[in-house]
A protein has these predicted regions:
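Conserved SAM/AdoMet-binding glycine-rich loop
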Residues: 1-3
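Auxiliary Fe-S-binding modules of radical SAM enzymes
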Residues: 6-16, 20-79
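Core of compact, soluble alpha-helical bundle domains
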Residues: 80-125
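Short, surface-exposed acidic
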Residues: 133-135, 171-178
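Immediate flanking context of iron-sulfur cluster ligation sites
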Residues: 135-155
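Local cysteine-cluster metal-coordination motifs and their immediate loop/turn environment
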Residues: 153-165
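Glycine-rich active-site/cofactor-binding loop and its immediate structural neighborhood
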Residues: 160, 167-174
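Short Fe-S-cluster ligation motifs
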Residues: 182-197
Length: 197
């Protein structure tokens, strides 16, 4: 995951699977929308995380108090997910849709920050799902203890059988870096959705 502070028009010329966007001081909203459009073209998960203290929209400058910058970004409703079909299918599973973040999980995410949570996801996936035949496959992901574990169960990324069933990722072969990035993108997408509720 990359967190990008936008203080001028820019192109996405870096490799990432998840982009969190924060408006810098005096950012023009059209710059945020342009970055979102680039994410859509590249199928990069995009989240508008914060407006910043002043946002320019249609030539007007809006001063936004610090305690409202996150909620105003959510209110813009410009987030993009390349995983909509997957989340629609997951919503029909009683088991998958029974997972949600508890207050302590939300607090943990807020304290650690999105980049750290993404690092944890990559570490867990590499260690627990990366090998062709993971140790204790089917039981390697705890049901609690970390927000990423909850997200794995909610998204069918908890074991190699579920990866095959929900994501058509073949079993009994090492996961490629691209597959691991995709899995982490799905996990982060679920966490973003939960934190927005």
């Amino acid at each position: 995951m990359k967190i990008l502070q936008v203080d001028q028009p820019q192109s996405i010329d870096f490799d990432t699977d998840v982009l969190g966007c924060i408006a810098g001081p005096n950012c023009d909203f059209s710059w945020i929308l342009d970055i979102r459009d680039q994410c859509i073209k590249k199928k990069i998960l995009f989240r508008f995380l914060s407006t910043g203290p002043a946002l320019i929209k249609d030539g007007k400058i809006y001063s936004i108090p610090k305690n409202q910058q996150v909620s105003q970004a959510r209110k813009a409703q410009i987030d993009y997910s390349p995983n909509e079909d997957l989340f629609c299918r997951l919503s029909h599973s009683q088991f998958r849709s029974s997972f949600y973040l508890r207050p302590k999980d939300r607090t943990y995410i807020q304290q650690k920050g999105w980049e750290t949570i993404d690092e944890h996801a990559h570490d867990f996936i590499a260690a627990r799902l990366g090998p062709a035949i993971p140790y204790h496959d089917g039981k390697q992901t705890p049901m609690k203890g970390h927000p990423v574990f909850l997200a794995q169960h909610a998204t069918g990324t908890c074991c190699r059988n579920c990866l095959y069933k929900w994501h058509q990722i073949p079993k009994e072969k090492d996961l490629t870096d691209k597959e691991q990035d995709y899995i982490c993108q799905v996990i982060m997408d679920w966490l973003f959705r939960q934190m927005s509720k």
